C-alpha cells in the first residue's frame, strides 16, 4: 500500500462500554478537533482494567487499516493521578493470521515502515504491539497543545487518549506531544509464553475464550508449530490442565471437524493454536477457562 487514506482515521478501543455516553463524548471531541476524521470503533466491551485483554484486541490492527491511522487505545485505572499516556510510532507492521500474510484481496496490502501511531496509557497496554511491530520513537503525552491543562480527573481515557489522538490525526507532530521516552520507561507486562521441547512437544496456556463462540485460544503460535514440525494434517494429542484430552489432526477450519458439535484443533485468525467444536461451544459446557495449561504432543 503506497498511499495513506485520503481522510484521517482514528481506530478507537476502550473499556468504556456502550451503555452510556462516554464513548460518544470521546468521539465528539475527536470530530471537533479533527473535523474530517473517520472514527472506527474497534471494541468498547473489553473487561474493565484488563490490560492483557486490551492488548490482544489492538496488536493485529495495522494490517487491516490504511497507512496513517492513529490507534487510540485505552483502559485507564490510573485516571486522576500523575500518570500520562504514551504515543509511539511503530516500526514495521507485522504480517499475521493463520498463514502469516498481509490482509486484503489477492496477496493483500503490504504496509510501509513508520506508517502508524498508537496512543495509550503507559500501563502495559502496548506490550504486544511493541513486541510484534517494534517502534521507532515514543513520547510521553503531556503538552497542553494536545491535552487539557486541567484534565478531568475521573476520565483520563477521554482527556489523555481521545483528545490527543485527534490532534495527532489532524497532523500535530508526534515529536511535540511531550518528552521522548527511553525504552525502559515504557511499561510492559510479560505475555503468556509457549515452549517447544527438543522432542517437538509444545506447552503453553489458554489465553482467551473466544466469546461468544466458546472457542479456546492458546499461547502456542504458528511459529512454535512450525518449529515442532507440526502442519495441517498432523495428528496431535492436546491436554488441558492434565484433565481434558483431545486427539485430533490439525485442521484449517471448523467444518473439517465433521458433524455439528465435533471437536476441531486449528490455527485461529490471529495465528495461535486453538480448540473448538463445529458450530458449538467448547468452553462453556466444560467450564474451560483462561490460564489452564496446554500440552501438545504428536499422537
From Swiss-Prot:
Matching NCBIfam families: fluorinase
Catalytic activity: fluoride + S-adenosyl-L-methionine = 5'-deoxy-5'-fluoroadenosine + L-methionine
Binding-site residues for S-adenosyl-L-methionine, renumbered to this chain: 15, 20-22, 76, 157, 210, 215, 269-270, 277-279
UniProt function note: Catalyzes the formation of a C-F bond by combining S-adenosyl-L-methionine (SAM) and fluoride to generate 5'-fluoro-5'-deoxyadenosine (5'-FDA) and L-methionine.
Name by which UniProt lists this protein: Fluorinase
Activity regulation details: Activity is not severely affected by most metal ions (Mg(2+), Mn(2+), Co(2+) and Fe(2+)), but both Cu(2+) and Zn(2+) are strong inhibitors.
InterPro entries per record: Fluorinase, SAM_HAT_C, SAM_HAT_N, SAM_OH_AdoTrfase, SAM_OH_AdoTrfase_C_sf, SAM_OH_AdoTrfase_N_sf
Similarity remark: Belongs to the SAM hydrolase / SAM-dependent halogenase family.
A Pfam family recorded for this sequence: SAM_HAT_C
Keywords from the UniProt entry: S-adenosyl-L-methionine, Transferase
Amino acid at each position: 500500500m503506497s498511499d495513506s487514506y485520503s481522510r484521517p482515521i482514528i481506530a478507537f478501543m476502550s473499556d468504556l462500554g456502550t451503555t452510556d455516553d462516554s464513548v460518544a463524548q470521546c468521539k465528539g471531541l475527536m470530530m471537533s478537533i479533527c473535523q474530517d476524521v473517520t472514527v472506527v470503533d474497534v471494541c468498547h466491551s473489553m473487561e474493565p482494567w484488563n490490560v492483557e485483554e486490551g492488548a490482544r484486541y489492538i496488536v493485529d490492527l495495522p494490517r487491516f487499516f490504511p497507512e496513517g491511522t492513529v490507534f487510540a487505545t485505552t483502559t485507564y485505572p490510573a485516571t486522576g493521578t500523575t500518570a500520562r499516556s504514551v504515543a509511539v510510532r511503530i516500526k514495521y507492521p507485522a504480517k499475521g493470521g493463520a498463514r502469516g500474510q498481509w490482509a486484503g484481496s489477492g496477496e493483500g496490502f503490504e504496509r510501509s515502515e513508520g506508517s502508524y501511531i498508537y496512543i495509550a496509557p503507559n500501563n502495559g497496554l502496548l506490550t504486544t504491539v511493541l513486541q510484534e511491530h517494534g517502534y521507532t520513537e515514543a513520547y510521553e503525552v503531556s503538552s497542553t497543545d494536545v491535552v487539557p491543562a486541567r484534565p478531568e480527573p475521573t476520565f483520563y481515557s477521554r482527556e489523555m487518549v481521545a483528545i490527543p489522538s485527534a490532534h495527532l490525526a489532524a497532523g500535530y507532530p508526534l515529536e511535540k506531544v511531550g518528552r521522548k521516552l527511553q525504552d525502559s520507561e515504557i511499561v510492559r507486562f510479560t505475555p503468556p509464553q509457549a515452549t517447544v521441547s527438543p522432542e517437538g512437544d509444545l506447552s503453553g496456556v489458554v489465553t482467551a475464550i473466544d466469546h461468544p463462540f466458546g472457542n479456546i485460544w492458546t499461547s502456542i503460535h504458528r511459529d512454535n508449530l512450525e518449529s515442532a514440525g507440526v502442519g495441517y494434517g498432523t495428528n496431535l494429542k492436546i491436554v488441558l490442565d492434565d484433565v481434558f484430552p483431545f486427539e485430533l489432526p490439525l485442521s484449517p477450519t471448523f467444518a473439517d471437524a465433521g458433524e455439528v458439535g465435533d471437536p476441531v484443533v486449528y490455527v485461529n485468525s490471529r495465528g495461535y493454536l486453538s480448540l473448538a467444536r463445529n458450530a458449538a461451544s467448547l468452553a462453556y459446557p466444560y467450564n474451560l477457562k483462561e490460564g489452564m495449561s496446554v500440552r501438545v504432543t504428536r499422537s
